[in-house]
Amino acid sequence: MKHFQIPSFSVLIIALALPHIVEVQSSAEKLDFKSSIVDIEGLGAMSFPNSGAAEAQEAFFRGVLLLHSFEFTQAAEAFRKAQDLDSDFALAYWGEAMTYNHPLWGQFDGKKGQAALLRLAPTREARQAKAPTERERRYLNTIETLFFFEGEKETRDRAYMKAMRDLHETYPEDDEARAFYALSILGSKNGSRDFATYMQA
């Protein structure tokens, strides 16, 4: 895969940690992000509490960390492995769907993203029922917005950005929500880049 000089997720996370971020008091379930850090050799460490089976965790975390590096093909393979190990692991299907959206390059495969989510369950309601926690349901909702929301891609990008903002504001200690929200801001500009957008991200 050809690599481009673009901001990494690490840079986006650092930028979003600056003081201009508005802190939001959340009434959501209490999650301990600091004590649930997982280290995947060669890729890095992260915290992403989830309800997947223990045997599917390494593949899932590998998939998310590969997303950080924009290694979409390898990430999709890792998420599918997590699905094989736990067929009801909702976030593994969320992760695979994420690999079919490349917002910084304006690349989007809606059919593959929808197919990944439909393998979890045939309807939005059934997919939501597969997610045991409110936070996981919110993650699923963001990707549903991107792949199933009516309207042109630009409209769906804006709706996805709003859904990611809501997720980030509900779980301000969730670094993954913070990073994916930053990426959604950049993706909402339909491939164009400007200073104001980068500052917002």
Where are these predicted regions, by residue range?
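Bacterial N-terminal signal peptides
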Residues: 8-19
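N-terminal pre-domain segments of enzymes
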Residues: 24-53
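Amphipathic alpha-helical repeat scaffolds of TPR domains
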Residues: 54-62, 88-100, 128-151, 173-191
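Canonical positions in the second alpha-helix
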Residues: 81-82, 120, 167
